[in-house]
Protein backbone atom coordinates (compact mmCIF):
# COMPACT_ATOMS: atom_id res chain seq x y z
CA UNK A 1 0.00 0.00 0.00
CA UNK A 2 1.49 3.31 -1.04
CA UNK A 3 1.38 5.58 2.00
CA UNK A 4 -0.29 8.96 1.85
CA UNK A 5 1.94 12.01 1.72
CA UNK A 6 3.61 13.38 4.81
CA UNK A 7 2.91 16.96 5.86
CA UNK A 8 4.28 19.50 8.29
CA UNK A 9 2.37 17.84 11.13
CA UNK A 10 1.94 14.26 9.94
CA UNK A 11 4.84 11.83 9.48
CA UNK A 12 5.03 8.15 8.59
CA UNK A 13 7.28 5.43 9.98
CA UNK A 14 7.68 1.77 9.07
CA UNK A 15 9.92 -0.85 10.65
CA UNK A 16 10.60 -4.52 10.14
CA UNK A 17 9.68 -6.38 13.31
CA UNK A 18 12.18 -9.00 14.39
CA UNK A 19 9.61 -10.63 16.66
CA UNK A 20 6.93 -10.93 13.99
CA UNK A 21 9.37 -11.89 11.25
CA UNK A 22 10.63 -14.77 13.37
CA UNK A 23 7.08 -15.92 14.09
CA UNK A 24 5.90 -15.81 10.46
CA UNK A 25 9.15 -16.93 8.87
CA UNK A 26 9.26 -13.97 6.50
CA UNK A 27 9.73 -10.20 6.77
CA UNK A 28 6.84 -8.61 8.69
CA UNK A 29 6.41 -4.89 9.16
CA UNK A 30 4.72 -2.42 11.46
CA UNK A 31 3.86 1.12 10.48
CA UNK A 32 2.45 4.20 12.13
CA UNK A 33 1.16 7.63 11.28
CA UNK A 34 2.57 10.21 13.67
CA UNK A 35 0.88 13.53 14.47
CA UNK A 36 3.47 16.00 15.71
CA UNK A 37 2.60 18.82 18.10
CA UNK A 38 2.57 22.47 17.21
CA UNK A 39 6.06 23.92 17.61
CA UNK A 40 7.88 20.60 17.31
CA UNK A 41 10.76 22.02 15.25
CA UNK A 42 10.94 25.25 17.24
CA UNK A 43 11.35 23.46 20.58
CA UNK A 44 14.15 20.87 20.21
CA UNK A 45 14.52 20.73 23.99
CA UNK A 46 10.97 19.42 24.50
CA UNK A 47 10.21 15.78 25.27
CA UNK A 48 6.63 14.70 24.72
CA UNK A 49 4.07 12.29 26.17
CA UNK A 50 2.89 9.69 23.65
CA UNK A 51 -0.71 8.78 22.84
CA UNK A 52 -1.52 5.58 20.95
CA UNK A 53 -4.87 6.00 19.19
CA UNK A 54 -5.79 2.39 18.45
CA UNK A 55 -8.23 1.33 15.76
CA UNK A 56 -8.56 -0.23 12.34
CA UNK A 57 -5.86 0.07 9.66
CA UNK A 58 -5.16 3.77 9.10
CA UNK A 59 -4.56 4.63 5.45
CA UNK A 60 -3.45 8.02 6.77
CA UNK A 61 -3.91 10.11 9.91
CA UNK A 62 -7.59 10.81 9.36
CA UNK A 63 -9.68 13.43 11.10
CA UNK A 64 -6.99 16.13 10.86
CA UNK A 65 -7.41 18.88 8.27
CA UNK A 66 -5.51 22.16 8.05
CA UNK A 67 -8.11 23.86 5.84
CA UNK A 68 -11.85 24.52 6.19
CA UNK A 69 -14.25 22.14 4.43
CA UNK A 70 -14.09 22.02 0.67
CA UNK A 71 -16.74 24.51 -0.52
CA UNK A 72 -17.25 22.52 -3.73
CA UNK A 73 -17.90 19.18 -2.02
CA UNK A 74 -21.19 17.58 -2.94
CA UNK A 75 -23.06 16.79 0.31
CA UNK A 76 -23.94 13.17 0.98
CA UNK A 77 -26.46 11.72 3.42
CA UNK A 78 -25.68 9.52 6.42
CA UNK A 79 -28.39 6.90 6.83
CA UNK A 80 -26.85 5.83 10.12
CA UNK A 81 -27.19 9.26 11.70
CA UNK A 82 -29.99 10.65 9.52
CA UNK A 83 -27.62 13.53 8.77
CA UNK A 84 -27.55 15.51 5.50
CA UNK A 85 -24.06 16.50 4.39
CA UNK A 86 -22.24 14.32 6.91
CA UNK A 87 -19.15 14.29 4.70
CA UNK A 88 -18.98 18.06 5.07
CA UNK A 89 -19.48 17.72 8.82
CA UNK A 90 -16.55 15.31 8.95
CA UNK A 91 -14.30 17.81 7.22
CA UNK A 92 -15.56 20.58 9.48
CA UNK A 93 -14.64 18.63 12.61
CA UNK A 94 -11.29 17.57 11.16
CA UNK A 95 -10.53 21.26 10.73
CA UNK A 96 -11.75 21.98 14.26
CA UNK A 97 -9.32 19.37 15.54
CA UNK A 98 -6.48 21.14 13.72
CA UNK A 99 -7.55 24.41 15.35
CA UNK A 100 -7.61 22.72 18.75
CA UNK A 101 -4.29 20.97 18.17
CA UNK A 102 -2.49 24.23 17.33
CA UNK A 103 -4.19 26.43 19.95
CA UNK A 104 -1.89 28.03 22.56
CA UNK A 105 -3.42 26.24 25.56
CA UNK A 106 -3.47 22.71 24.09
CA UNK A 107 -0.91 20.43 25.77
CA UNK A 108 1.81 19.39 23.35
CA UNK A 109 1.86 15.63 22.83
CA UNK A 110 2.56 13.12 20.06
CA UNK A 111 -0.29 10.93 18.76
CA UNK A 112 0.21 7.80 16.67
CA UNK A 113 -2.11 5.50 14.73
CA UNK A 114 -0.57 2.05 14.24
CA UNK A 115 -0.63 -0.10 11.11
CA UNK A 116 -0.59 -3.76 12.15
CA UNK A 117 -2.43 -5.59 9.40
CA UNK A 118 -1.81 -9.33 9.24
CA UNK A 119 -2.88 -12.37 7.20
CA UNK A 120 -6.23 -12.54 9.04
CA UNK A 121 -7.38 -8.93 9.41
CA UNK A 122 -6.53 -5.27 9.01
CA UNK A 123 -5.64 -5.19 12.70
CA UNK A 124 -4.01 -7.54 15.23
CA UNK A 125 -5.80 -6.34 18.38
CA UNK A 126 -2.32 -5.28 19.58
CA UNK A 127 -1.81 -8.31 21.84
CA UNK A 128 0.16 -11.53 21.58
CA UNK A 129 -1.75 -14.41 19.99
CA UNK A 130 -1.09 -18.05 19.14
CA UNK A 131 -2.40 -17.49 15.62
CA UNK A 132 -1.22 -13.99 14.79
CA UNK A 133 2.03 -13.89 16.73
CA UNK A 134 3.55 -11.47 19.25
CA UNK A 135 1.95 -8.25 18.03
CA UNK A 136 1.60 -6.93 21.56
CA UNK A 137 5.31 -7.23 22.26
CA UNK A 138 6.24 -6.01 18.78
CA UNK A 139 4.20 -2.82 19.11
CA UNK A 140 5.13 -2.12 22.74
CA UNK A 141 8.81 -3.05 22.67
CA UNK A 142 9.84 -2.49 19.03
CA UNK A 143 7.63 0.08 17.29
CA UNK A 144 6.88 2.45 20.15
CA UNK A 145 10.50 2.83 21.36
CA UNK A 146 11.53 3.52 17.75
CA UNK A 147 8.91 6.27 17.47
CA UNK A 148 9.77 7.71 20.87
CA UNK A 149 13.43 8.02 19.94
CA UNK A 150 12.76 9.44 16.48
CA UNK A 151 10.23 12.04 17.65
CA UNK A 152 11.66 13.01 21.04
CA UNK A 153 9.08 11.41 23.29
CA UNK A 154 9.66 10.92 27.01
CA UNK A 155 9.80 7.16 26.59
CA UNK A 156 8.59 6.10 30.03
CA UNK A 157 5.44 4.28 31.09
CA UNK A 158 3.98 7.22 33.01
CA UNK A 159 3.99 9.25 29.77
CA UNK A 160 2.24 6.74 27.47
CA UNK A 161 -1.53 6.59 27.01
CA UNK A 162 -4.06 4.62 25.00
CA UNK A 163 -7.44 5.39 23.54
CA UNK A 164 -9.72 4.14 20.81
CA UNK A 165 -13.20 3.00 19.96
CA UNK A 166 -14.74 -0.37 19.05
CA UNK A 167 -11.78 -2.56 18.04
CA UNK A 168 -9.57 0.28 19.26
CA UNK A 169 -11.50 0.37 22.53
CA UNK A 170 -10.76 -3.30 23.20
CA UNK A 171 -7.13 -2.70 22.26
CA UNK A 172 -6.80 0.29 24.56
CA UNK A 173 -8.10 -1.68 27.55
CA UNK A 174 -6.45 -4.96 26.58
CA UNK A 175 -3.01 -3.42 26.10
CA UNK A 176 -3.32 -1.58 29.41
CA UNK A 177 -4.21 -4.83 31.18
CA UNK A 178 -1.48 -6.93 29.54
CA UNK A 179 1.20 -4.22 29.86
CA UNK A 180 0.17 -2.45 33.08
CA UNK A 181 3.53 -0.79 33.74
CA UNK A 182 4.17 0.37 30.17
CA UNK A 183 1.14 2.67 29.94
CA UNK A 184 -0.43 5.17 32.32
CA UNK A 185 -4.06 5.12 31.30
CA UNK A 186 -6.57 3.81 28.79
CA UNK A 187 -9.74 5.41 27.50
CA UNK A 188 -11.80 2.66 25.89
CA UNK A 189 -14.93 3.63 23.98
CA UNK A 190 -17.52 1.05 22.87
CA UNK A 191 -14.96 -1.76 23.28
CA UNK A 192 -15.40 -5.11 21.58
CA UNK A 193 -16.48 -7.78 24.10
CA UNK A 194 -14.50 -7.40 27.34
CA UNK A 195 -16.42 -10.18 29.12
CA UNK A 196 -17.23 -13.30 27.12
CA UNK A 197 -20.35 -13.93 29.14
CA UNK A 198 -21.64 -11.11 26.93
CA UNK A 199 -19.89 -11.96 23.67
CA UNK A 200 -22.33 -9.72 21.83
CA UNK A 201 -25.51 -11.76 22.53
CA UNK A 202 -23.87 -15.04 23.64
CA UNK A 203 -22.50 -16.36 26.93
CA UNK A 204 -19.81 -18.68 25.55
CA UNK A 205 -19.36 -20.39 28.93
CA UNK A 206 -22.97 -21.31 29.67
CA UNK A 207 -24.92 -21.23 26.41
CA UNK A 208 -24.94 -24.37 24.30
CA UNK A 209 -25.62 -22.80 20.93
CA UNK A 210 -24.49 -19.43 19.60
CA UNK A 211 -27.19 -19.07 16.95
CA UNK A 212 -30.32 -19.83 18.96
CA UNK A 213 -31.53 -19.17 22.47
CA UNK A 214 -31.42 -22.25 24.70
CA UNK A 215 -35.16 -22.94 24.70
CA UNK A 216 -36.73 -26.43 24.51
CA UNK A 217 -39.73 -25.73 22.28
CA UNK A 218 -38.61 -23.40 19.49
CA UNK A 219 -35.60 -21.85 17.77
CA UNK A 220 -35.26 -18.16 18.55
CA UNK A 221 -32.32 -16.62 16.65
CA UNK A 222 -29.80 -14.57 18.61
CA UNK A 223 -29.44 -11.01 17.35
CA UNK A 224 -26.07 -9.61 16.28
CA UNK A 225 -26.90 -6.05 15.22
CA UNK A 226 -29.58 -3.51 16.09
CA UNK A 227 -30.32 0.19 15.77
CA UNK A 228 -30.71 2.61 18.66
CA UNK A 229 -34.42 1.84 19.11
CA UNK A 230 -33.75 -1.88 19.30
CA UNK A 231 -34.81 -3.00 15.83
CA UNK A 232 -32.76 -6.07 14.89
CA UNK A 233 -30.69 -5.54 11.76
CA UNK A 234 -29.16 -9.02 11.43
CA UNK A 235 -28.65 -12.22 13.42
CA UNK A 236 -25.47 -13.87 14.64
CA UNK A 237 -26.10 -16.85 12.37
CA UNK A 238 -26.36 -14.56 9.35
CA UNK A 239 -23.11 -12.78 10.23
CA UNK A 240 -21.19 -16.02 10.70
CA UNK A 241 -22.55 -17.66 7.56
CA UNK A 242 -21.63 -14.59 5.53
CA UNK A 243 -18.04 -14.98 6.69
CA UNK A 244 -18.09 -18.65 5.66
CA UNK A 245 -19.00 -17.53 2.16
CA UNK A 246 -16.29 -14.85 2.07
CA UNK A 247 -13.37 -17.01 3.17
CA UNK A 248 -12.34 -20.33 4.69
CA UNK A 249 -10.21 -20.95 7.79
CA UNK A 250 -10.92 -17.56 9.40
CA UNK A 251 -9.74 -15.70 6.31
CA UNK A 252 -12.91 -13.78 5.47
CA UNK A 253 -11.56 -10.53 6.86
CA UNK A 254 -14.69 -10.40 9.01
CA UNK A 255 -15.24 -9.57 12.66
CA UNK A 256 -16.13 -13.02 13.99
CA UNK A 257 -13.14 -14.57 12.22
CA UNK A 258 -10.58 -12.19 13.66
CA UNK A 259 -11.95 -12.63 17.18
CA UNK A 260 -11.36 -16.37 16.85
CA UNK A 261 -7.90 -15.79 15.40
CA UNK A 262 -6.88 -13.46 18.25
CA UNK A 263 -8.62 -15.09 21.20
CA UNK A 264 -8.40 -18.75 20.24
CA UNK A 265 -5.66 -21.38 20.18
CA UNK A 266 -4.24 -22.93 17.04
CA UNK A 267 -6.48 -25.76 15.87
CA UNK A 268 -5.43 -29.22 14.72
CA UNK A 269 -5.34 -28.04 11.10
CA UNK A 270 -3.00 -25.15 11.90
CA UNK A 271 -5.73 -22.53 11.62
CA UNK A 272 -7.60 -20.87 14.51
CA UNK A 273 -9.76 -23.23 16.55
CA UNK A 274 -13.43 -22.34 16.21
CA UNK A 275 -15.28 -21.14 19.29
CA UNK A 276 -18.37 -22.78 17.80
CA UNK A 277 -19.31 -24.84 14.77
CA UNK A 278 -19.87 -22.23 12.09
CA UNK A 279 -22.65 -24.20 10.43
CA UNK A 280 -24.66 -25.23 13.48
CA UNK A 281 -23.60 -22.77 16.19
CA UNK A 282 -22.69 -25.49 18.72
CA UNK A 283 -20.22 -23.95 21.19
CA UNK A 284 -16.91 -25.70 21.98
CA UNK A 285 -16.41 -25.53 25.78
CA UNK A 286 -12.67 -26.25 25.50
CA UNK A 287 -12.15 -23.29 23.20
CA UNK A 288 -14.30 -21.15 25.49
CA UNK A 289 -12.13 -22.03 28.47
CA UNK A 290 -9.01 -21.00 26.55
CA UNK A 291 -10.66 -17.68 25.74
CA UNK A 292 -11.53 -17.15 29.41
CA UNK A 293 -8.05 -17.78 30.73
CA UNK A 294 -6.23 -15.71 28.12
CA UNK A 295 -8.40 -12.89 26.75
CA UNK A 296 -11.51 -12.37 28.89
CA UNK A 297 -10.43 -8.99 30.26
CA UNK A 298 -12.97 -8.85 33.07
CA UNK A 299 -12.12 -12.37 34.21
CA UNK A 300 -8.38 -11.65 34.06
CA UNK A 301 -8.81 -8.52 36.17
CA UNK A 302 -10.82 -10.46 38.75
CA UNK A 303 -8.37 -13.37 38.78
CA UNK A 304 -5.23 -11.23 39.00
CA UNK A 305 -6.44 -8.14 40.86
CA UNK A 306 -4.03 -8.70 43.74
CA UNK A 307 -1.12 -8.02 41.37
CA UNK A 308 -2.81 -5.96 38.64
CA UNK A 309 -4.88 -3.73 40.89
CA UNK A 310 -2.03 -1.63 42.33
CA UNK A 311 -0.63 -1.14 38.81
CA UNK A 312 -3.96 -0.18 37.24
CA UNK A 313 -5.40 2.15 39.87
CA UNK A 314 -6.67 5.26 38.13
CA UNK A 315 -5.87 3.95 34.65
CA UNK A 316 -9.14 2.35 33.44
CA UNK A 317 -11.80 4.50 31.74
CA UNK A 318 -14.61 2.89 29.70
CA UNK A 319 -17.47 4.48 27.76
CA UNK A 320 -20.33 2.99 25.76
CA UNK A 321 -23.79 3.79 24.53
CA UNK A 322 -26.50 1.80 26.25
CA UNK A 323 -27.95 0.96 22.84
CA UNK A 324 -24.69 -0.09 21.22
CA UNK A 325 -25.37 -1.49 17.76
CA UNK A 326 -23.60 -4.77 18.61
CA UNK A 327 -24.71 -5.21 22.25
CA UNK A 328 -21.22 -4.33 23.49
CA UNK A 329 -22.66 -2.40 26.44
CA UNK A 330 -23.68 -5.68 28.09
CA UNK A 331 -20.07 -6.70 28.70
CA UNK A 332 -19.33 -3.23 30.08
CA UNK A 333 -22.09 -3.67 32.68
CA UNK A 334 -20.37 -6.85 33.86
CA UNK A 335 -17.00 -5.10 33.95
CA UNK A 336 -18.49 -2.23 35.94
CA UNK A 337 -19.93 -4.67 38.49
CA UNK A 338 -16.44 -6.03 39.07
CA UNK A 339 -14.55 -2.75 39.11
CA UNK A 340 -16.95 -0.91 41.39
CA UNK A 341 -16.46 -3.66 43.96
CA UNK A 342 -12.67 -3.80 43.80
CA UNK A 343 -10.69 -3.34 46.99
CA UNK A 344 -7.01 -3.08 47.87
CA UNK A 345 -7.12 -0.94 45.81
CA UNK A 346 -10.39 0.42 44.44
CA UNK A 347 -9.90 0.80 40.68
CA UNK A 348 -10.50 4.58 40.86
CA UNK A 349 -11.33 4.99 37.18
CA UNK A 350 -14.43 5.86 35.20
CA UNK A 351 -17.27 4.05 33.43
CA UNK A 352 -20.02 6.03 31.72
CA UNK A 353 -22.99 5.33 29.46
CA UNK A 354 -24.72 7.31 26.74
CA UNK A 355 -28.51 7.23 26.93
CA UNK A 356 -29.90 5.64 23.75
CA UNK A 357 -26.49 6.11 22.12
CA UNK A 358 -25.24 3.63 19.56
CA UNK A 359 -21.82 2.37 18.58
CA UNK A 360 -18.78 4.66 18.91
CA UNK A 361 -20.14 6.75 21.80
CA UNK A 362 -17.10 8.04 23.69
CA UNK A 363 -18.32 9.65 26.89
CA UNK A 364 -19.53 12.99 25.52
CA UNK A 365 -22.81 13.75 27.28
CA UNK A 366 -23.31 17.10 25.51
CA UNK A 367 -23.29 16.18 21.80
CA UNK A 368 -25.03 13.63 19.58
CA UNK A 369 -23.02 10.53 18.74
CA UNK A 370 -22.66 11.71 15.14
CA UNK A 371 -20.49 14.58 16.40
CA UNK A 372 -18.87 13.13 19.51
CA UNK A 373 -17.36 10.27 17.48
CA UNK A 374 -15.44 12.94 15.53
CA UNK A 375 -13.93 14.39 18.73
CA UNK A 376 -12.03 11.52 20.36
CA UNK A 377 -8.83 13.56 20.65
CA UNK A 378 -10.52 16.59 22.20
CA UNK A 379 -12.37 14.32 24.61
CA UNK A 380 -9.36 12.43 25.91
CA UNK A 381 -6.37 14.78 25.73
CA UNK A 382 -7.65 16.87 28.69
CA UNK A 383 -8.22 13.66 30.67
CA UNK A 384 -4.67 12.54 29.85
CA UNK A 385 -3.26 15.87 31.01
CA UNK A 386 -5.16 15.50 34.28
CA UNK A 387 -3.82 11.97 34.70
CA UNK A 388 -0.25 13.20 34.19
CA UNK A 389 -0.73 15.96 36.74
CA UNK A 390 -2.00 13.45 39.28
CA UNK A 391 0.43 10.59 38.68
CA UNK A 392 3.74 11.76 37.22
CA UNK A 393 6.62 10.51 39.40
CA UNK A 394 8.88 12.93 41.28
CA UNK A 395 11.36 14.58 38.96
CA UNK A 396 9.38 13.72 35.81
CA UNK A 397 9.45 16.11 32.88
CA UNK A 398 6.06 17.77 33.06
CA UNK A 399 7.14 21.15 31.72
CA UNK A 400 9.30 20.98 28.58
CA UNK A 401 6.24 20.13 26.48
CA UNK A 402 4.00 22.79 28.06
CA UNK A 403 4.93 25.69 25.81
What are these regions (language model features)?
Residues 1-403:
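Non-catalytic cap/lid and distal C-terminal segments of serine-dependent acyl enzymes
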Amino acid sequence: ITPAKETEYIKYVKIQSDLLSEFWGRPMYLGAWVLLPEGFDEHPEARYPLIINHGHFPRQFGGFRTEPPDPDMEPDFSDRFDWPGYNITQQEYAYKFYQYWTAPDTPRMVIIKVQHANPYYDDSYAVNSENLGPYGDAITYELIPHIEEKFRCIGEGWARFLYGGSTGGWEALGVQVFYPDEYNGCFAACPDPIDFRAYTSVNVYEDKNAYYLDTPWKKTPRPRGRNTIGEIQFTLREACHLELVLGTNNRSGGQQDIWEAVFGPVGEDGYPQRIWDRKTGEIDPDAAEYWRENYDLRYILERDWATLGPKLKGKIHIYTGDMDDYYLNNAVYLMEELLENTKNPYYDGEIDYGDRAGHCWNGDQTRPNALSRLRYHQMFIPKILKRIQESAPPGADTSSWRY
